[in-house]
Structures are given as C-alpha cells and as structure tokens.
C-alpha cells in the first residue's frame, strides 16, 4: 500500500533534507514498520519524539491504511 511519510524538525536529515517521501509499505504495517522501510529506526534516534497519522497523534505500533500520512516529530524542547 502507498502512504506518505513526512519528517519534521531535525529528522529531515534522514531524508537528506527533504521533508516528505511516498513509500510503498506492506498492508497493515505499523508506523514503526513504515519508518523502517525508509531506513529510520526510531529506537536509535536520541531526539525522536512521536508520530502522528492524518494529523492525529498515535502510538508507534498503530497500524496504517492505504493513503495515510505519517508524520514523525523530534522531541520538543525549549527554555
């Protein structure tokens, strides 16, 4: 199935500065599996924050559907 993966903040470095990519992923895959198909292992990224699907925050283990838009965000900090 086809989905769109968008990276935010410093995570765009994993897409060589691009903010989004279309990805062909297995039917019923999780957000974690979708990120792995494009070379992103969230557990290895210190500043990985959270994911959202279709603008709604979800768990990394939630399943995706055809046409979903998966966004990955870094940890947010400030001071």
Q: What is each PLM-predicted segment?
A:
Residues 1-78:
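Ubiquitin-like/PB1-type beta-grasp interaction modules and other compact soluble beta-rich domains
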């Amino acid at each position: 199935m086809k989905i769109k993966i968008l990276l935010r903040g410093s995570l765009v470095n994993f897409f060589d500065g691009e903010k989004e990519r279309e990805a062909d992923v297995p039917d019923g895959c999780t957000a974690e599996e979708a990120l792995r198909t494009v070379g992103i292992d969230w557990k290895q990224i210190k500043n990985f924050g959270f994911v959202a699907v279709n603008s709604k925050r979800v768990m990394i283990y939630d399943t995706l559907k055809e046409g979903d838009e998966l966004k990955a965000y870094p940890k947010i900090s400030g001071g």
